[in-house]
Amino acid sequence: VREDVIERANGERGIYGVVDKDPACIVLPIDSTPDGDFLYLVEQFRYTVGARFMELPQGGWEIADVYPEEMARGELREETGLSAERMTLLTTLQIGYGVMNQKQYVFLAEGLTHGEHDRDAEETDLEVHRVSVAEFEAMLLDGRIVDNCSAAAWGIYRLWRERRAGR
């Protein structure tokens, strides 16, 4: 966290608080079955807001030279125990550029296989949930999922999927 002395467009000087964060990733783990598509979500306690929330698997590593796909595969395995046959980078977003300079890579994970998770100490209470697409969308609309990154990633995925279907 830093405070920069800035000069605004009108010439006034001021202080601007900035949170410096390493890149992160968010993963849409989609399990396509004859019964439909399902997503894997994680539920965990978020200290900053003092409550448990459901969201897509996401996070970052404090390693300078990590490839985004490697980070996404690692976060998926760490939090859910899932591995993906295919990872597709859908886009890169800025999470909250009003106060933070962190970028987030949005990945689609397909061809999922189950394995053992490898959670960090702060993730020991994390729970994994498999939900249908209809349930996930209902959760976004009724406020059970309030994570802006999960909502944005889903919107990006829907646009990507529609454009691929229109080929």
Model-predicted segments: where are they?
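A glycine-rich, hydrophobic loop/mini-helix early in the fold
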Residues: A24-E55
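Short, amphipathic C-terminal "tail helix"
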Residues: A151-R167
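Unchanged
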Residues: G14, P23-I26, D31, G59-C149
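Residue-level structural signal for beta-strand termini and adjacent loop
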Residues: V18-V19, F45, I95
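Acidic, metal-coordinating catalytic segment for phosphate/diphosphate chemistry
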Residues: V1-L28, P34
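Short hydrophobic/aromatic patches on beta-strands that form ligand-binding or substrate-lining surfaces
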Residues: V49, F107, W154
